[in-house]
Amino acid sequence: MSSHSQEPVGEENFDDSEYDRPNKSQVKREMHALLDLGKELVELSPERLRQLPLEERLYEAIREAQRTTGREGRRRQIHFVGKLMRSAPAEAIRAQLDTWRNGSREETAAMHRLEALRERLLTDDDALTAVLQRNPDADIQHLRALIRAARKEAAANAALSQGQEPQRKQYRALFQALKNLSA
């Protein structure tokens, strides 16, 4: 027998303060999340990338991945981007990406509302009254002229034979005027 005594390793003597690091599966999930975030960044335009809090080395790695055309080379470069993402402010980047995604949904919804308003203006004269009540400083003569021209354009488009391109100039001009009113 040995001269020094060893304490038995049992649950009562187990000190888990030494093992407070995340387990291997958790680390792997985090690395895959960073890799997925890196893949999203590779799909962004250079202008959008410049708006993110990225280190220059990470920015250049992303741009290189965007330029790489070979499948395996691109995969390797994206994995390198994922590795560099470990030191990047991932939460700030995710927050900005979410803002861009949700902001574009809001913009799309606003565009749909304007399109519906334009359709109401073309079919219902009372819709113009509602627009003018919400925007008392709007140029009523200009709006009426645009509505008249868009209605005339729609009537001319209805008379076109199949295969002819319809005119949309006044239709678009009315939309732009409504967009400027809402801005």
Swiss-Prot record:
A Gene Ontology biological process term: assembly of large subunit precursor of preribosome
RNA-binding recorded as keyword: yes
SUPFAM superfamilies associated with the record: PSPTO4464-like
Pfam families membership: DarP
Broad class of the protein's primary localization: cytoplasm
Region (Disordered), start-end ranges: 1-27
Gene Ontology MF terms: ribosome binding; rRNA binding
Keywords carried by this UniProt record: Cytoplasm, Ribosome biogenesis, RNA-binding, rRNA-binding
Gene3D superfamilies given in the database record: PSPTO4464-like domains
Family membership: Belongs to the DarP family.
Protein name: Dual-action ribosomal maturation protein DarP
Organism: Bordetella pertussis (strain Tohama I / ATCC BAA-589 / NCTC 13251)
